[in-house]
A protein has these predicted regions:
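Cation-handling catalytic/transport regions enriched in His/Asp/Glu
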Residues: 1-96
Length: 96
């Protein structure tokens, strides 16, 4: 159940981000992936913090903290990998 709520929060973060940018000129509505993940990741963290706060047992808290840490590590590695890929891609493209 926690995964489903986290996924919903993530997607609502994307929806919020799109809503905020709706009235901007068309060329300003497009953004890089790392920016796109900002609001969605923030929404996930709100849910993770609330879930952790409501945990009843130490075992539940430890499991939730473990999931939170795994997600944070995956996100940081994902963002860094995308940055390296995009930097190399555009550098190679610029060279021809």
């Amino acid at each position: 159940m926690v995964n489903e709520v986290s996924t919903l929060a993530h997607e609502l973060g994307h929806a919020f981000h799109s809503h905020v940018m709706w009235d901007l000129p068309t060329l300003n509505q497009d953004y890089a992936m790392n920016v796109a993940e900002t609001a969605s990741t923030f929404a996930e963290l709100i849910v993770a913090d609330a879930t952790l706060k409501e945990a009843k047992t130490d075992e539940e808290k430890i499991n939730l903290l473990d999931v939170k840490l795994q997600n944070a590590i995956a996100m940081f590695m994902n963002i860094h990998a995308r940055f390296i890929f995009e930097s190399n891609f555009y550098a190679a493209r610029q060279k021809g």
